[in-house]
Every structure is written in C-alpha cells, then in structure tokens.
C-alpha cells in the first residue's frame, strides 16, 4: 500500500512539472498602442485594424493615462512588432532607405540630376554649370 502512494506522488509530481513547462512554453503577448487607429475606440474595429494593418494577434480598447480609452495591439513577444506605421492593405510600399524608388522594370527614364536640372534629351552629358 505504501509503495502505491509513492508511485502516485511521483506521477503527481511529474504531472505538476509538465503543466508548469507547458505554461512557460506558451507565447506571451506584448502590448503596444496602435499606430493606425484613431477616434472613439470600438473593440471590434480596434481588433480588426490591429490584425489586418499592424499584423498583431489581437487588439482591444483600454483606459490608460488620463482616463482616455485607446486601442492597444497585442503581439507575440518572441517576434518583434513592426517598427514603422504599416501601409494599408494593397498600397504600394514606401521607397527603400536610400530615399528614391528603383527605376521601372521596363527601363523608363533615368532620374533627374541631383542639382535639379533636367537631363539632356539626347542622353549626352549635361552642360557645365554657369559661372554667373
């Protein structure tokens, strides 16, 4: 009979440790104020905008500083949330860090010179700058 209670205690201890490990392995959510939601906060709209525009797992309205209700997005802490304000779905992405967008795929025309003048029509070199 005593051996049975030792086995029961050992199984119970293993079970408790396993439950603790499952909770630790679960993803933890990080809260961040929405960058795209404005106006009176509505939970359904906040949730939808956080998921679709900010790639969050969830969104909800909460009162924080000064009693104002704001939309908060919840991200998986193991992944980093988007840094910049995302573009709406279907919009063209912003230019690369260099500042100017890449030329069109079909060739297109070269970008204008940095000094603001227009490029020569024949494709030759531009005239020298004036001295006056």
Curated annotation (Swiss-Prot):
UniProt-annotated location(s): Secreted
GO CC annotations on file: extracellular region
Any GO BP: defense response
Epitope recognized by IgE antibodies of mugwort pollen-sensitized patients, as annotated region: 64-70, 79-87
GO molecular function terms noted in the UniProt entry: molecular function activator activity
Disulphide bonds in the chain: 30-77, 41-61, 46-71, 50-73
Effect of residue 30 to S: No effect on IgE reactivity
Effect annotated for changing residue 46 to S: Loss of IgE reactivity
Record's compositionally biased regions (Pro residues): 83-114
Residues making up the signal peptide according to the UniProt record: 1-24
Transmembrane segments: none
Ranges for region Disordered: 81-132
Record carries keyword Magnesium: no
Alphabetized SMART domains for the sequence: Knot1 (SM00505)
InterPro entries assigned: Scorpion_toxin-like (IPR003614), Scorpion_toxin-like_sf (IPR036574)
Keyword list, A-Z: Allergen, Disulfide bond, Glycoprotein, Secreted, Signal
Primary location class: secreted
Effect of residue 71 to S: Loss of IgE reactivity
Residue segments, region Defensin-like domain: 28-77
Bias type Low complexity, positions: 115-124
Domain observations: Contains several extensin-like repeats in the C-terminal section.
Family note: In the N-terminal section; belongs to the DEFL family.
Protein name per the record: Major pollen allergen Art v 1
UniProt organism field: Artemisia vulgaris
């Amino acid at each position: 009979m005593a051996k049975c209670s030792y086995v029961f205690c050992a199984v119970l201890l293993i079970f408790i440790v396993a439950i603790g490990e499952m909770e630790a392995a679960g993803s933890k959510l990080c809260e961040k104020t929405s960058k795209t939601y404005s106006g009176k906060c509505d939970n359904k709209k906040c949730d939808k905008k956080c998921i679709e525009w900010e790639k969050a797992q969830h969104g909800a309205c909460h009162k924080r500083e000064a009693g104002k209700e704001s939309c908060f997005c919840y991200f998986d802490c193991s992944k980093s949330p988007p840094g910049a304000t995302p573009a709406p779905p279907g919009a063209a992405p912003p230019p690369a860090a260099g500042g100017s967008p890449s030329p069109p795929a079909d060739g297109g025309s070269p970008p204008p010179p940095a000094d603001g003048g227009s490029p020569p029509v024949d494709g030759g070199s531009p005239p020298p700058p004036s001295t006056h």
